[in-house]
């Protein structure tokens, strides 16, 4: 792919991610949501034809956004783990996880279709999140802040539970409180 084409592709993915973040806010306010490819193209400052050249379907674009945002979330973990005490760093990263989940809600039925088709797998997502959580736990155990008997996979399962068990009318606030409880439960 030529450099200019790769740059435009990245612009489209970034614009779609930003649009989904805006839609997640709208969804929390009860507004109807649906990703508009015209709005994504305008936000990316490319023509609709350019968008479709790189992403022939809405699902292809959303899959690229999903993978990019998951990579960004997971890649941020080691640096964040090294930048603050383990409990504070892990909670800050968990809040980023909430942002990731919020933007996925805006994908709605499209995300369900991608999971059903196998384009996105829960196993891969969970494995990547588990790998990302490990540095926080290792740093916390080494500092005497966290218990040593909790595997990263259990933390990921509890994070998902906190998000999906929260009352829809207070989704973000309750999820944040549940994640703070999870941090308290990890303490030595």
Regions found by a protein language model. Give the residues of each.
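Short hydrophobic/aromatic patch on the recognition helix
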Residues: 45-55
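Hydrophobic alpha-helical connector segments
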Residues: 64, 77-103, 121
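Short amphipathic alpha-helical segment with a characteristic S/N-K-E followed by hydrophobic residues
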Residues: 57-62, 73
